[in-house]
């Protein structure tokens, strides 16, 4: 069964093709093999945690490790961080455009809290500690994070810097 392409795998393949055309096939194979192994090792995770593992965490680890075959560790880290930052900028622009719709901005706090509790809740491996709710304020500390935990488990906690 073919995996759904994530933004990380797409960006990794683009980097391999543009910067390392002679090694692109080898890099893509290394990425695919590592990602398959990581997915197999984490197959028992909850459905909620799988959402994060498949879309972001494990492709990030596989890309980071594969890039280290052709560049220094710090450069590979910056490349993978660049992928994430580019997605964040794009998402920010999309949200900012939506918030120009009259009245929509009033709905955002409630929707944000509800979706964050759902997607980043205990079932997904997070341990949120809500510090303040109400009066238009929601403060939360994440006491446990599967992004950090998984990256640390695989020897690359720096991916969460």
Residue map of PLM features:
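Amphipathic interaction/junction segments at domain boundaries or subunit interfaces
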Residues: 66-154, 159
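A structural signal for well-ordered alpha-helical scaffolds and beta->alpha junctions
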Residues: 60, 160-161
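N-terminal leader/assembly segments
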Residues: 1-90
